[in-house]
Regions:
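Acidic, proline/glycine-rich low-complexity IDRs
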Residues: 1-23, 28, 32-48, 98, ...
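Short, intrinsically disordered low-complexity segments
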Residues: 29-102
Length: 134
């Protein structure tokens, strides 16, 4: 009896989805600006876009009301390891990207759309830059 009860609990357990980091980097292989990121998303359905051009910020509001925020920064992460990574990826422009981890199903297609228009990649703002979206 004891084993059947345990088996039932295991079957009822919902599969867990790995949480994405909330902080990302968008490493662009072209010298682009916040305006270019906004333009790349103009034809993406189901999002609202807002830009603060002077600050280099683009807000992408998703259909669930949460947002993806792009903040343009200097392509220099101020440490040798990180800058070697940027050089390897041929970074010409860099954006800090903030997402809501619970919106992964909405965020990932947006990231893929951006890199379909602007060559580059998204990577976690983590010690090893993972995960990657190429």
């Amino acid at each position: 009896m004891k084993n059947k009860s345990k088996l039932k609990k295991i079957k009822e357990k919902k599969p867990s989805i790995a949480k994405l980091p909330s902080q990302w980097l968008f490493v662009a292989k072209e010298d682009v600006t916040a305006r270019d990121v906004k333009n790349a998303l103009e034809d993406y359905e189901g999002v609202e876009l807002e830009i603060w051009e002077a600050a280099g910020i683009v807000e992408v509001v998703l259909s669930d009301g949460k947002s993806i925020d792009f903040e343009q920064t200097e392509a220099d992460l101020r440490d040798e390891y990180s800058n070697a990574f940027l050089a390897k990826e041929q970074a010409k422009a860099l954006f800090y990207v903030t997402i809501h981890p619970d919106s992964a199903q909405l965020v990932m297609p947006v990231m893929k759309h951006v890199i379909g228009k602007i060559p580059g990649l998204f990577c976690g703002d983590t010690d090893d830059f993972s995960p990657f979206v190429r």
